[in-house]
């Protein structure tokens, strides 16, 4: 069975994704703080606004779990089971829906899809989760007591002010400019893309993983239908149509032979407990 969709679907669902073949080089170009942001957007599918709302209390260092919680709502429970909106108001007198700069950062919709179950972020490969927690030790965090005004958000400037999506996007585009010089063959793919292209990359990697499994004859008996379900859950898509955009694309030879995808594929296959689908958390036999 062919995994190549018809051309009409491809055109209708066209997206601008960061080329996953260059993801590791992007991480190498970044400083530790930028690397953490790129890992959350690229390997977890988070939006910039979601990443920048990470707080000092949303990281489980022991079990290597991360949560991104909407600061304007009490729907997601944070530290000690307290709604994030109430926590910020009571501890810091912050109203993220009204006060600047918080209101300018926003959040959009939560991820994963069933966030009320307090599910942590999903990583498409454990090697990136490991790199994230290794990189955390390289970031010099400014204590809350040294921040004026006081706040708990993780990503800050040297003066303790919150990083903005605009600042992060400028750094990302500077890195893309360097990558274009290093890899002229990727100029077209790198032109005009922003940080959101890393979220798109996540969807493309997951869809490429499905294609790789099908093309290889699924020797490991991986539940192929679960891959799309997991992608929808991880990216927080309420509609399956939003997820289908990534899967309804033509597959090229690099899906089968590409060095990067083979490396990611191998790490996925090696994890026998199937971390990537998280069947207990992400809905075993759950269909849209």
Descriptions of predicted regions:
Residues 1, 9-13, 78-82, 211-224:
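Short, flexible/disordered intra-domain loops and linkers
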Residues 1-22, 158:
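Flexible interdomain linker/hinge and immediately adjacent N-terminus
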Residues 20-48, 227:
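Basic, Lys/Arg- and aromatic-enriched nucleic-acid-binding interface segment
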Residues 41, 52, 232:
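The alpha-helix within a helix-turn-helix
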Residues 54-135, 141-144:
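Conserved tyrosine-mediated DNA breakage-rejoining catalytic core shared by Y-recombinases
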Residues 93, 256-288:
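C-terminal secondary-structure termini that scaffold catalytic or DNA-interacting sites
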Residues 161-162, 169-233:
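Short, basic (Lys/Arg/His-rich) helix/loop patches that form interaction surfaces
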Residues 222-225, 234-266:
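Catalytic-site neighborhood detector that most strongly recognizes the C-terminal catalytic loop/helix
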């Amino acid at each position: 069975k062919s995994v190549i969709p018809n051309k009409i679907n491809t055109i209708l669902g066209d997206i601008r994704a960061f080329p996953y073949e260059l993801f590791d080089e992007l991480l190498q170009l970044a400083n530790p703080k930028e690397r953490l942001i790129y890992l959350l957007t690229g390997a977890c599918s988070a939006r910039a606004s979601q990443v920048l709302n990470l707080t000092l209390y949303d990281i489980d260092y022991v079990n290597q779990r991360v949560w991104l919680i909407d600061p304007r709502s009490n729907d997601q429970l944070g530290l000690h089971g307290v709604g994030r909106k109430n926590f910020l108001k009571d501890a810091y007198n912050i109203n993220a829906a009204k006060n600047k700069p918080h209101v300018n950062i926003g959040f959009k919709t939560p991820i994963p899809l069933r966030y009320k179950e307090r599910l942590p972020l999903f990583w498409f490969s454990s090697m990136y989760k490991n790199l994230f927690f290794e990189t955390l030790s390289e970031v010099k965090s400014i204590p809350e007591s040294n921040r004026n005004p006081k706040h708990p958000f993780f990503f800050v400037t040297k003066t303790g002010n919150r990083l903005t999506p605009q600042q992060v996007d400028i750094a990302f585009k500077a890195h893309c400019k360097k990558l274009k010089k290093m890899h002229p063959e990727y100029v077209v793919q790198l032109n005009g893309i922003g940080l959101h292209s890393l979220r798109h990359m996540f969807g493309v990697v997951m869809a490429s993983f499905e294609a790789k499994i099908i093309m290889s004859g699924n020797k490991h008996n991986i539940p192929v239908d679960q891959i799309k379900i997991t992608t929808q859950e991880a990216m927080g898509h309420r509609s399956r149509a939003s997820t289908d955009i990534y899967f309804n694309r033509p597959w090229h030879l690099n899906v089968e032979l590409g060095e990067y995808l083979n490396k990611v594929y191998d790490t996925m296959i090696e994890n026998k407990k199937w971390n990537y689908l998280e069947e207990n958390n992400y809905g075993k036999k759950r269909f849209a």
